[in-house]
């Protein structure tokens, strides 16, 4: 079982979502990720991954793996803000690795 750690930024983003169905689906995906089932995801950089949730406007959750057991959810967004969200996730990852 994986340990999931949520960044403060991710928590704020998640609970600010107006689409309750999307929030529910994202939380379900996080629960499945605890068991190692990340569903539809894509590796974006060496240690940055994008979990894709196909509901509403197409939500994305950006995360990194630290070791074999700890997963950190960095930030989230939808398809319209994808480029900006990836830049933000990379910046957060860089800060974590210092």
Question: Model-found features: residue ranges?
Answer:
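Solvent-exposed, charged helical/coil patches
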Residues: 1-31
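Enriched for short, Lys/Arg-rich terminal
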Residues: 3-4, 12, 23, 38, ...
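Amphipathic alpha-helical interaction segments
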Residues: 18-21, 49, 70-71
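A short, surface-exposed loop/turn module that caps and links secondary-structure elements
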Residues: 28-55
